[in-house]
């Protein structure tokens, strides 16, 4: 039998006492009182912060939104089917944040930045708060560089600049998403990173957008954030902020970004649902009182940064759906007042075959020609004026049968200009092609053609000038101006192609 000496025992005890580490963990916990409809009411959690993440016993995460005197209203970031009444909840001490990195490019993720495209995990070393403050006045500079959409009607008359917020508004099925996706396609080779946020849409619609971007190689510079119609309201409400956080990551790294929110009406509806279930008082159209703040704090994050911060930019194209053209409803008026202009898509124009169905009369860009190259300013002014006069004359001509020759000519010119603005989906044009197209129309070269021949002629003209007069594109891209030399090359090219075209049509 081994005998232990007393001093050995005391040494062992001393060592153990020295190794003892007194660690006290204070956890702020509470108990579930009630759960249902994506909302949980928690008793306890006395020191929880507004917007703090809380974790339920079975692993679901929630956000503490309502801090009341006797309980806390938590919105769930999941279905919460396994949460039981009386189970415990603990505060995490964290606010919602997502991992960010270049590896997100080309991926489809959800509002929590988890991949949903079945292509494995995304590696990220940094993270950003989902809700971070917008850049201040000193951090910004005014918008001065163009962001080309590839659509003649927009780039000439409603120009968008890098760092601008331009609302796309219209009824359902008027081509709002098509305008947004065309803009993404047109950013190829422009060093612009695109983020497309789909909120409360059909999964089939999102899949269609992703497929069209993949087919044209646009997913290489695009991130898709999707929360479909079957997602919890909390995640639909968070999705735009997740997209903004990803775009901000690139903006602060001196890059240009474009973010599309498709659409903010659905986000407002999700927020209304959450607010009513949390028993917040309803306001106009049953939306809560802070629905304006919901959108303003999101859209204010779009900016053109100052030269000290690297001149990165984040351009936002929010989409809002109207009911039978009513732009005076609550959400449309809110977003119109926050943004720097709106592109109004009309169902009547869409049904009349004018696509993109942009109503140029009430669409406006408040940044205006500051975001256009000089060559575009030179040709776009005349186009705007002629179309405005045509719209006025067309309304007048309906009541009068005997019109003088000058009026008839102006109406004929207007019809051809309207034809010139029509474009197929997913066929964006370069700025040089747009300039030559507008110049052809405003200088009367299309007046001798039948309306049905206009688009065919313009397609052939663009091909002819690209192959036979490459110097025109070179002058425009290098000087950004329609110089006398460029104009004479263009005139020559149009004359040659017009003669060839008329000859072909006669045969």
Swiss-Prot record:
Q: Which GO terms describe its cellular component?
A: chloroplast thylakoid membrane; proton-transporting ATP synthase complex
Subunit info here reads: F-type ATPases have 2 components, CF(1) - the catalytic core - and CF(0) - the membrane proton channel. CF(1) has five subunits: alpha(3), beta(3), gamma(1), delta(1), epsilon(1). CF(0) has four main subunits: a, b, b' and c.
Kindly give the PROSITE patterns that the UniProt entry links to this protein.
ATPASE_ALPHA_BETA (PS00152)
The record's section on NCBIfam families has: atpA, PRK13343.1
Write down a Pfam family by its short name. Answer: ATP-synt_ab_C
What GO terms are given for molecular function? ADP binding; ATP binding; proton-transporting ATP synthase activity, rotational mechanism
Positions bearing Phosphothreonine: 257
What top-tier enzyme class does this entry carry? translocase
Q: Where in the cell is it found?
A: Plastid, Chloroplast thylakoid membrane
> Which key words tag this protein in UniProt?
ATP synthesis, ATP-binding, CF(1), Chloroplast, Hydrogen ion transport, Ion transport, Membrane, Nucleotide-binding, Phosphoprotein, Plastid, Thylakoid, Translocase, Transport
Q: How does it sit in the membrane?
A: Peripheral membrane protein
What's the name of the protein?
ATP synthase subunit alpha, chloroplastic
**Site annotation Required for activity: residues:** 363
Q: What is its EC number?
A: 7.1.2.2
Query: Function of this protein?
Result: Produces ATP from ADP in the presence of a proton gradient across the membrane. The alpha chain is a regulatory subunit.
Task: Indicate which residues the UniProt annotation says bind ATP.
Answer: 170-177
Which reactions appear under catalytic activity for this entry?
A: ATP + H2O + 4 H(+)(in) = ADP + phosphate + 5 H(+)(out)
Family stated for the protein in its record: Belongs to the ATPase alpha/beta chains family.
